[in-house]
Amino acid sequence: MTNIVVVGAGYAGVLATKKLEKKLRKKGVANETQITIIDKHPYHTMLTELHEVAACRVGEESVKMNLDQIFAGRKVKVVLDTVNKIHFEENKITGENGEYSYDYLVLAAGSKPTFYGVEGAEEHSYTLWSYDDAVILRDRIHDCFRLAADEPNAQKRQELLTFYVIGAGFTGVEMMGELAEYVPVLCERFHIKREDVKLVNVDGLSRPVPVLPEKLSGKVERRLKKMGVEVLLNANVVEVGENFIKMKEGEEVKQYTAGTIVWTAGIESAELTAEAAKEIKSAGRGRIEVDAYLRSVDYENVYVIGDNMFYTAPGEENPVPQMVENAEHSADAAANNIAVAITKKGKLEEYAPKFHGIMVCVGGRWATARGGMAKHQMNLPSFFAMFAKHFINIIYFIQVMGWTKVCSYLTHEIFTIRNRRSFVGGHFSNCTPSFLLVPLRVWLGAVWVFEAVMKIVEGWFQKPMLSEFFGGANAWYNSIIASYFGIAPAQSVDAVASATAAGADVAASAGTLLLDWDFGLFETIFVSGKDLASSTLADYAFKLNIPFVNWSVDNMVLASDGMQMFMQIVIVLLELAIGLGLMGGLFTFPSAAVSVILQFMFLSTTGLYLNGIWMVFASVAVLIGAGRTIGLDYYVGPFLKKHWKNVKWVKRWYLYND
C-alpha cells in the first residue's frame, strides 16, 4: 500500500488531494494507495473571502466547507490533527495526536501573518488569516459600535470608533473597503454619526496594491477616499500598543489613538514549513525550494505546493507569487507527477504557471482588475471585474464541492444579501413572504386541473387529436400571415400539409399580423384574431416558430396514431399532476418547473393567447419556496432532504442543498 500524506487543507492541499484521488482512480490503482489529508480544522476555509465575514456582509458559514463533505465517496482519509514535525529521513510525520508514515508527502501548510519585528504588533492587533480571525474581528467591530453608543466619555468614544488597517495590499484594501461599506449600516443601527467614525488604511509604500498597474492603484485609492477612508501612504508602523499606534512618516515618529488595529501587512510560511525549511533547502520567509516538478530539491518524494513553494519559472526574474492561482496550478501539477511516480505511466509535468490577472474588491459593490492571457491583458471596469471575481469563485467551487457550494455561494452573495451590498445591489435579494404566494399557487394549480379535465371531456383519452390540434393552429397563423402579405388563402393552407378540414375552416377567418420576425433559428409571430379595434386579450396570440420543434412534431409526435395517443395521455396526466401538486403545495418546485416547460411547448407549437400567458409568469413566481407556507412541502421537504443527503452517490456528486 502506497501512503500519500497531504499536510494542509487550504486551496492547494484540497485541490491536490481531489485531483490525485481522481487520477489514481482512473489509472486503476486507487485500491493500492491511501491518501490522507491532515489539518488542524475539520473544514476548508476560503481565505480570500474572510473580509466579507469580518465586515458582516455574509455569514461565517459561507467561507468554510466541511472536509468530510468535500471528500465524501472518495478514497481519502481526513485526519484532524496539528502536525508539529516532519522527519524527512524517516518518511514520518509527528502530530499532536499521532504519527503518520508516508511514501509521498505533499506539503501545503499555507502561511501565517508576519509582523516584521514591529513591537506590540502581534500582541495588540487583529489579524485576518483564518476563519477564527474573521469571526473575532467581526464581533470586535460590532462591540466597538455597541459600546460607543453608550459611552459618555468623548475621548473613549472616539477611541472605540477609530479603526486602522495596516497594509494596503489585497487583504488590507479589501478589509478596509468592506469595513467602510459596513460602517453606515452600523451607524444607522446604533444611532452614531458617520463623521464620528475614523477609518485609516496605512502602508509603507507609495500606492495601494502595488502589483496593480499604477492607474488601477489610483482608482483603488480614490474609491477608498470616496468611502470616507483616510489613506496614509509612505508611513511605516514602528510600534503598536493596546490603544495606540506609532508610525514613522518621513523622519518624524507620530503616535495616534486607535481602538482597533487590523494587521494585514504580509505573510510568511506557517510554523511547520518554517521548521522544515531549517532542514531542507529553502529561501526567504520559510519557502522551500522545489525543482521543475515541484519536488523538494533534497527529497524527491516530498512535493511542496501553494504558498510554501519557492520556484522561479524559466525566463522569469521573480519566484511564483503566493496567490490562489498559483495554489491551483501547483496542485494540478503535483497531483499529476505523484500519479506518474506511483504508476510509472505517463510523463512528469514541468511546472509552467500561467497567471491570468489580478483583481481587488473594495466592498461588495466595486472592484477593479487586470486580466486576460499572459501577453494580452486589459483593465476591467468595476461591474465586469466583480462579475469575473464571482465567476472565478464559482469555477473553484465546482471543482471542490460541486452544485451544493455553488448554490450556497450564490445564495449568500446574491439572493440573501442585505443592505444592497452586492454588485447587483439588492435587486435579487428582496424577500417576499411566501404566504402571499399561496393564492397564486392554488389558482395556478386549479387552472391546470381545469385544463386537464377539459381535455379529457374533449376526448384526449379516446382518439388521436394532436394532428387536428397542431394543424388548426398552424393554419390559423399561416392564413393571417398570408392575408397580410397578399397571398391567396389557399396557398397558405396548402403549405400546411397536416392541416385538417377543421383547421382550414379556422384559417378562413384571417385576423391581423402585428409582428413577424425571422431570426433564422426561430421566428416570432404576434397576431390578433380580429381587427385591432375589436380585439381583446383573448384574441391576441404569440408563437415561437422553431424549425427543430416543428420537425420533432411532424416526425415524432405525429408519426403514428399510437404516438399521438401516448403524448396526449402524458400531457393530460402532467397537467393533473402539476395542478394537484401546486394546489396542495407538494413538490412545488418540480411542479412549477414542469409548468414552465409545458408552457414553452405550447408557445412553440400552437402559441399562447395573451389572456393565458399569465400562467408562465405565475409558474416562475412560485418556483422557489411557494410550497413551504400552507403547503405539504413544509412537512415533506425537510424529511426528504434529511434522507436524500445520506445517499452515497448524492454525497459523492454533491447533489444536495444545505
Predicted regions span which residues?
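Short hydrophobic core segments
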Residues: 5-7, 100-112, 130, 166, ...
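A Rossmann-like FAD-binding core segment of flavoenzymes
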Residues: 78-85, 181-290
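C-terminal, flexible cofactor-proximal segment of oxidoreductases
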Residues: 326, 330-424
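Alpha-helical membrane-anchoring segments
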Residues: 411-574, 588-593, 598, 603-615, ...
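FAD-site-proximal beta/loop scaffold in flavoenzymes
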Residues: 123-157, 244, 254-326
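Rossmann-like dinucleotide-binding core of oxidoreductases
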Residues: 157-212, 216-223, 230-232, 320-361
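FAD-binding core/adjacent interface of flavoenzyme oxidoreductases
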Residues: 1-3, 76-162, 251, 262
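Beta1-alpha1 glycine-rich phosphate/pyrophosphate-binding loop at the start
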Residues: 1-77, 163, 173-211
